[in-house]
Amino acid sequence: GPANIRRRVGWQHAERAGADALVVRSVGSDIRRFPHTGMMSSDSDGEWAEIPVIAVSNPDADHIRRLHELGEDINFTIRSTAGWRGEVVSGNVVLDIIGRETPEEIVLIGGHLDSWDLGTGAVDDGAGVAITVAAAELIARLPQRPRRTIRVVMFGAEEVGLLGARAYAAQHAGEV
């Protein structure tokens, strides 16, 4: 949504305005002091932020806002070990339950395997993976196989740009 867009591209506006850093309010609703994490986008030239960008939790953002409203000076010292550590290999996990009548017709169900560092992955997307695997197990236990092939795909690298889904779509473009 709009909050995620601001997080992804806000650094571009901050850099153009001469900011030394950007502090972003978490888009998550967690009342504890764990900010929602996510990725930023490069600009139209493929360049990335040169200023540090951090997210703060909602309680901390509320406190900063109250201090600002009281006219207090607000200063930050940012220490972060975040950064690009190079490319890594990711993969998709694929399971087919072959259809009995038209196996070449594929019904695809899936979820994604990755999550963000501060999350448990339970909601994004552990729940989706669990539901998908449970549905596949129920289908596999039916007295007879389904008419069409059921393909279960657990996509990798969703959180960093739908990379697993895009790779799957490119590899299977003729099947769609």
Label every model-predicted segment:
Residues D30-R33, G86, L162:
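Short, well-ordered, mixed-charge alpha-helical segments that flank or form enzyme active sites
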Residues S29, D60, E159:
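Residue-level detector of flexible, active-site-proximal loop/helix-junction positions
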Residues A3-R7, H13, V89-N92, S115-V176:
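Acidic/histidine-rich catalytic neighborhood of metal-dependent amide-processing enzymes
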Residues M40-A122, A134-E137, R141-R147, A170:
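Soluble metallo-hydrolase cores and metallopeptidase-like ectodomains found primarily
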Residues G1-D45, E50-P52, T120:
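Extracellular/luminal Protease-associated
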Residues R25, G110-H112, V153-F155:
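Generic beta-strand/beta-sheet core signal
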